[in-house]
Amino acid sequence: MVKLAFPRELRLLTPSQFTFVFQQPQRAGTPQITILGRLNSLGHPRIGLTVAKKNVRRAHERNRIKRLTRESFRLRQHELPAMDFVVVAKKGVANLDNRALSEALEKLWRRHCRLARGS
């Protein structure tokens, strides 16, 4: 049985871990959201989230975006390559409803899977 938990090992926690991804990322994006990824040597994917107050004013909207992104990652973690991902929310992401945001994330996860197979 596949575990769909979201333990601490699957998160980017320190600034150096984020910097590692920002140095040489593979990018996949939409006008509202970008996912940066970089291969890691851990054997499993990890995720970090950046939702700036400048782009999404209200705290409950930022929390909704982060919650939906974490849930999308949690459900797809076993299909994703061993990469560190940073999800960057841009202006306009707060205008997406839950379904549109989930569909955009699914499309970007699939694109990263293709990019990882190609490299």
Curated annotation (Swiss-Prot):
A Pfam family recorded for this sequence: Ribonuclease_P
Matches recorded under PROSITE patterns: RIBONUCLEASE_P (PS00648)
A cellular component annotation (GO) from this entry: ribonuclease P complex
MF terms in GO: 3'-tRNA processing endoribonuclease activity; ribonuclease P activity; tRNA binding
Keywords: Endonuclease, Hydrolase, Nuclease, RNA-binding, tRNA processing
Species assigned in the record: Escherichia coli O157:H7
Subunit structure, as described in the record: Consists of a catalytic RNA component (M1 or rnpB) and a protein subunit.
Gene: rnpA
Enzyme Commission (EC) number: 3.1.26.5
Protein name: Ribonuclease P protein component
Catalytic activity: Endonucleolytic cleavage of RNA, removing 5'-extranucleotides from tRNA precursor
Function noted in UniProt: RNaseP catalyzes the removal of the 5'-leader sequence from pre-tRNA to produce the mature 5'-terminus. It can also cleave other RNA substrates such as 4.5S RNA. The protein component plays an auxiliary but essential role in vivo by binding to the 5'-leader sequence and broadening the substrate specificity of the ribozyme.
Family as reported in the entry's similarity comment: Belongs to the RnpA family.
InterPro entries documented for this protein: Ribosomal_Su5_D2-typ_SF (IPR020568), Ribsml_uS5_D2-typ_fold_subgr (IPR014721), RNase_P (IPR000100), RNase_P_CS (IPR020539)
GO terms under biological process: tRNA 5'-leader removal
SUPFAM superfamilies: Ribosomal protein S5 domain 2-like
